[in-house]
Curated annotation (Swiss-Prot):
GO terms for cellular component: cytosol. This is ATP-dependent dethiobiotin synthetase BioD. The active site is at K37. Its cofactor is Mg(2+). Its EC number is 6.3.3.3. Keywords: ATP-binding, Biotin biosynthesis, Cytoplasm, Ligase, Magnesium, Metal-binding, Nucleotide-binding. It is found in: Cytoplasm. Mg(2+) binds at T16, D49, E108. Pathway: Cofactor biosynthesis; biotin biosynthesis; biotin from 7,8-diaminononanoate: step 1/2. It catalyses: (7R,8S)-7,8-diammoniononanoate + CO2 + ATP = (4R,5S)-dethiobiotin + ADP + phosphate + 3 H(+).
Length: 226
C-alpha cells in the first residue's frame, strides 16, 4: 500500500494546505492521487477541507466518511449531532479500499495526532499502525513548536509509526529570531520536507500550482508511490 497520513502538532498549523500542496505536486508529476479526510467537523459553518484541497490541488478524487456540522473535536461534534463516530475497522477498510498500485493515498487527520477519530478512542496514529503508513507532521514556526513537535514524534515512536518528515505549514513573510531558530532546531528533529509561505491558501489556483510544483523534493515525492 502507498498511504501517507498527514497530521499536525495542533489544529490550525496548515495541514490542509500542506496536503493540497503535496497532492498538487504529485498530480502535476503524473502520479495518481486520492485524498481522504475520514472525519470532518464544522461542515455546518462551511468548513470543508476536502473541497479546499480539491480547489487548490486540482485532484478530483476526494473521499470522506463521516461529517459533522459543529466545529468541535470529532467526539464532541458527533455527540452534538446525535451520530456515532465510525469504528476503527470501518476507517481502515475505507482507506484500504481507496489504495492501489501506483497510487498515492493521502489521509488527513483532524487536529493533532491523538485526537479521537473513531469510536472506542481510535486515532490517526492507530490508523497508521493498522495501515502500515508513515506520518507527515505539519508544524508551526513560533514559540512552543519545539515541544509540540517533540511530543508528536515521541508519540509516533512509541507505536513504531515512521515519521515521513516535517513541513512548516505557515512560514511568515518576515521571520524573526524565534522563527529562524526554531526552523533550524526542527530540522534537527526530523527531515524538513517543505516550508510553505503563510497565506498560501489565498493564492490563485494557478499560482498555487506553481508554488506546489517545487514545494517538496521531487525525488522524495517519487519514493512515496509503491
Amino acid at each position: 500500500m502507498t498511504v501517507l497520513c498527514v497530521t499536525g502538532t495542533c489544529t490550525g498549523v496548515g495541514k490542509t494546505v500542506v496536503t493540497a500542496a503535496l497532492a498538487s505536486q504529485a498530480n502535476q508529476a503524473g502520479i495518481d492521487v486520492v485524498v481522504c479526510k475520514p472525519v470532518q467537523t464544522g461542515t455546518g459553518i462551511g468548513d470543508d477541507d476536502l473541497a479546499e484541497i480539491g480547489r487548490l490541488s486540482g485532484v478530483t478524487e476526494l473521499v470522506g466518511l463521516a461529517r459533522y456540522p459543529l466545529p468541535m473535536a470529532p467526539v464532541a461534534a458527533a455527540e452534538q449531532a446525535g451520530q456515532p463516530l465510525p469504528s476503527r475497522d470501518q476507517l481502515v477498510q475505507h482507506i484500504r479500499g481507496l489504495d492501489r498500485p501506483g497510487r498515492l493515498t493521502l489521509v488527513e487527520g483532524a487536529g493533532g495526532l491523538l485526537v479521537e477519530l473513531a469510536d472506542s478512542g481510535g486515532t490517526l496514529r492507530d490508523l497508521a499502525v493498522d495501515l502500515g503508513a508513515a506520518m507527515l507532521v505539519v508544524v508551526a514556526a513560533g514559540l512552543g513548536t519545539l515541544n509540540h513537535t517533540a511530543l508528536t514524534l515521541e508519540a509516533l515512536a512509541a507505536q513504531k509509526v515512521s515519521c515521513a518528515g516535517l513541513v512548516l505549514g505557515s512560514w511568515p513573510a518576515h521571520p524573526g529570531l524565534v522563527e529562524s531558530s526554531n526552523r533550524d532546531a526542527l530540522a534537527r528533529l526530523a527531515p524538513m520536507r517543505a516550508v510553505l509561505s503563510a497565506g498560501a491558501a489565498q493564492l490563485s489556483v494557478a499560482d498555487f500550482a506553481v508554488m506546489s510544483a517545487g514545494a517538496f523534493d521531487r525525488e522524495w515525492v517519487a519514493t512515496l508511490v509503491g
